[in-house]
Structure formats: structure tokens, C-alpha cells
A protein has these predicted regions:
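C-terminal and inter-domain tail/linker signature
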Residues: 1-104
């Protein structure tokens, strides 16, 4: 059972992911802390601070996040008191350039 704080974190996370997929940059950023940081392990790119994360999302993610046939299957969701970790299996047809995941 999740605490109220943990449930609030999950709700914000779900809003964040929905905004990413919908291409809504402002809502995506509104779900983040005042000094967000984003680090994508596969390509070692991302951003730090509101301006850096905004630029990364604008140039690489929001509105061009995934091809139309993307499927996301949650493997696990671990929620602590101050962090949330989601493990996913993502599948899609590589029909366009996706710099942050598969460069070139």
C-alpha cells in the first residue's frame, strides 16, 4: 500500500509521462522540480536545470518521443519516500531518427 505522499508522486509521474507522449512540453516541465536533471544512459545525453532540460525535451523528446506504433509494458514500479523507479520494455518500429535512444 502506498502512502499519500507516494501516491501523489505516482500521480505526478503518470501526468508527466502522458504529457511527454502527447507532446505537451509545458505540462511535462510543470511536473518536474525547480532544478530538474535528466540523464539518458544509452547515449549519455540529457540536460541540467530548467533551461537545459527544456532544450533537451524540445529538441529530442516532446512531440517526437516515439514512433506511432510504440508499445510500453511496465515490468516494475518501485516507489520510495523520495524517488520512483519504473522499469519498462519499450518496443517500436524504428521509422525515424531517435537521437536520445538510437543515434544516427
Amino acid at each position: 500500500m502506498l502512502s499519500d505522499k507516494q501516491q501523489a508522486m505516482v500521480s505526478i509521474f503518470e501526468k508527466h509521462v502522458a504529457a511527454e507522449v502527447a507532446g505537451d512540453l509545458e505540462t511535462t516541465l510543470a511536473t518536474m522540480t525547480d532544478v530538474p536533471h535528466l540523464h539518458n544512459i544509452p547515449t549519455m545525453i540529457g540536460g541540467y536545470g530548467r533551461d537545459g532540460v527544456r532544450a533537451f525535451y524540445r529538441d529530442h523528446l516532446v512531440g517526437q518521443f516515439f514512433p506511432p506504433d510504440v508499445k510500453m509494458e511496465r515490468v516494475s514500479l518501485t516507489v520510495g519516500d523520495d524517488q520512483l523507479v519504473e522499469e519498462l520494455v519499450i518496443s517500436f518500429t524504428h521509422t525515424r531518427k531517435i537521437d536520445w535512444m538510437l543515434p544516427g
